[in-house]
Structures are given as C-alpha cells and as structure tokens.
Amino acid sequence: MALYELFSHPVERSYRAGLCSKAALFLLLAAALTYIPPLLVAFRSHGFWLKRSSYEEQPTVRFQHQVLLVALLGPESDGFLAWSTFPAFNRLQGDRLRVPLVSTREEDRNQDGKTDMLHFKLELPLQSTEHVLGVQLILTFSYRLHRMATLVMQSMAFLQSSFPVPGSQLYVNGDLRLQQKQPLSCGGLDARYNISVINGTSPFAYDYDLTHIVAAYQERNVTTVLNDPNPIWLVGRAADAPFVINAIIRYPVEVISYQPGFWEMVKFAWVQYVSILLIFLWVFERIKIFVFQNQVVTTIPVTVTPRGDLCKEHLS
C-alpha cells in the first residue's frame, strides 16, 4: 500500500550558549550588520531625508482694485499720462493726470468658491494729438494658500508693453503665476508679505517710481508674475476714441514647493530604510541558520516540543 504525506509541521530547534560565548558574540555582530548597513546605504544614496516636497493647489486670489497706470506717448506729445487709485500719486502728476474708465469682473467658472479669472478693462481718454506707444500697468491682488503651506500675501501683476507705432488697444490674456525662490514652511501662518506692494499713503514720488516698486517686489522670496508672452497691440484709433487695455488674467492651479514637517520626513525615510532592511534580514537569517546548524560556533542544540504535545504528555 502506497503511503502519502497527509500532514506536516515544522519542528523548532533552539541553540543554547552562554552570554559571553562566541555564539552570543556572533549574534551581536549579525544584528549590527543587519540593521546598521541598510541605514548607511539609504543615507548615502541621497534623498534619505526629504528636504523639499510639492503639491498642487489652486490659490485663493482676489483683485484688490488697486491700479497704477503710466501711458507712454509719442514724441509729439512730449511725455506720458498717468493715473492710479492712490490719491497721493495723482496729486503728484499735475497736468499729466488723466482719469480713465475702469471696469472689472472676477469669475468663478467651476463654481468651487474660488475665483478663476479677472476681466479687466481700462479706457483712457486721449486728445486727437495724443498717441500711445507704450503701457506700464500694475494691478495688486490678495493671494492665499491653505492646504499644506499657509500663506497670505499681497502680490501684483506688472504689465509692460511698448511698440513703435501708436496703438488703439492692448489685449492681454495670461496667467498670474506663483514664483518661489525658496520652499514654504508647512507649519504656521506665513504672513511676511502681507503688506501693500505700493505705499499708497506716501506723499513722496520715489515710493511710486516703477523701478523702486519692482526692485522692492523682486526682493521677496515669493512673488506672482503675469505670464503672457504674446500681448496683442491693435492699431487704428479714431481721433475721439480712448486707448483701451483689455486684460484677462487667470488664476491657475499651482505646484507649491514646501519644506515637509518632521513626521513626513520620518515616514519618507522609514520606507526607504525598511525596503533595504528586508533584504539584509533575509540574507542574515540564512547565514545564522547555516552557522548554528553546522556548529560553526559551539552551542547546545535543543529540540523544542510544541505546547500541544506537552499537554498530551502531562495528561498521559
């Protein structure tokens, strides 16, 4: 009659020796070689500590209805026209002040509670002898991030265009993009730049100089910039028609760079360490089995009787 294996179970064998024996020293050395080298390998392979991470978020952007406009005129008009929403700036312009008609509208296209774009239109009245060759325009915004890094700041969009021929309209369709010189902190509120881009209460002309405003703004580590590589300059203005600036500024989803917190760094490092540790555990487990089974170090082998068998022997 043929015999078949119907059931099997492993027999546990232990190896005993003193704490000061070669076997104990071997186990201590094996443990050190099992757990320390994976840490060194993960650390030396770079990227062990996550110093920078990123995520996507659509910022909460609101137009602050602050405008500063400089329209550059042709040589026959000798100069420029200017206007802003800051009374102190307007008082400094004298005869060069020209008040335009401004209309704005912010739109939430996907109905998620966050505005997606700004429709901005400015009509600057001109005399028949005045011709616009260039435009410098500053619009200010309130800019907020909430998800991982909490940021509140006041930012701006700076538009500058000039052409050799007089224009009737400037059309802009671009994105208000976030620029970072360093990652944001993920802990606490970052309100370093929650200050006005333009000092609208100052009576000094220096504070309204565009070079000063732009230079001070670029000193920030976090800014916004209007990204429109191809503004459209339209020509052919009627004698009594105004010069028109028609702009659509979108608020797109941004990739935000930030410094991860302690537990996120630990989680990222732990995954790398464990993935390498599993290989070392498998290798050294095989080495220890070989060493003790072949008595490379002297020990006393003992076969451990399963608990169920001990109960049977006791009952018998």
Curated annotation (Swiss-Prot):
GO BP, sorted A to Z: camera-type eye development; cilium assembly; embryonic digit morphogenesis; in utero embryonic development; neuroepithelial cell differentiation; regulation of protein localization; smoothened signaling pathway; vasculature development
Please give the chief subcellular localization of this protein.
Answer: membrane
Q: Which InterPro entries match?
A: TMEM231
Keywords in alphabetical order, please: Cell membrane, Cell projection, Ciliopathy, Cilium, Cilium biogenesis/degradation, Disease variant, Glycoprotein, Joubert syndrome, Meckel syndrome, Membrane, Transmembrane, Transmembrane helix
Q: What is any one of the record's Gene Ontology cellular component terms?
A: ciliary transition zone
The family database entries (Pfam families) matched by this protein are listed as: TM231
Where does the record say carbohydrate is attached? Answer: N194, N199, N221
- How does the UniProt record describe the way this protein sits in the membrane? Multi-pass membrane protein
Q: Where are the transmembrane segments?
A: 23-43, 262-282
Localisation: Cell projection, Cilium membrane
Q: Which domain of life is it from?
A: Eukaryota
Instruction: Say what the protein does.
Output: Transmembrane component of the tectonic-like complex, a complex localized at the transition zone of primary cilia and acting as a barrier that prevents diffusion of transmembrane proteins between the cilia and plasma membranes. Required for ciliogenesis and sonic hedgehog/SHH signaling.
Q: According to the UniProt entry, which disease involves this protein? A: Joubert syndrome 20: A disorder presenting with cerebellar ataxia, oculomotor apraxia, hypotonia, neonatal breathing abnormalities and psychomotor delay. Neuroradiologically, it is characterized by cerebellar vermian hypoplasia/aplasia, thickened and reoriented superior cerebellar peduncles, and an abnormally large interpeduncular fossa, giving the appearance of a molar tooth on transaxial slices (molar tooth sign). Additional variable features include retinal dystrophy and renal disease.
> Self-association or partners: how does it assemble?
Part of the tectonic-like complex (also named B9 complex). Interacts with TMEM107.
Family affiliation: Belongs to the TMEM231 family.
Q: What is this protein called?
A: Transmembrane protein 231
